Amino acid sequence: KLLLVVCALALARVEAAAAAACSCAESLTVSKAKDRAEAVFVGTVVEANRERTQGGYEWRVKLSVEQAWKGSDEGEVVVYVLGDDCAVSFEAGKRYLVYARRQEGRGRLVTDSCARTALFDAGSEDLQKLGAGKQRAAR
């Protein structure tokens, strides 16, 4: 019985730690998320690759920008996804609303589960509050 109790407590601690790792210090409003971001845009995933790093893995996602509110003047943007377990899962061919910031010391664009990045939804609160944005010309 004691072993069963110890195992149950250990499992509860692991689940609590995983849940805490996926929670955000604060829930960002659309305005605050835009202010903190270097780039805010809607884009379609061209490719998403899981790459090995010294600390494990990370996702490198290339997106074709369709509409932008901040930054991302280029036609294609590469964003790295931090927090592999909790972050948005990017899939090739799907559209996303991305809030990305510059990673300190590396200068690359990154996003994570707390940045409001999400699968595109034309009726979302984010798009209503962001307004029109700048459309990219079709090639």
Name these PLM-found stretches.
Residues 1-7:
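Sec-dependent N-terminal signal peptides
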Residues 3, 13-139:
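Transition segments tied to proteolytic processing and entry into folded domains
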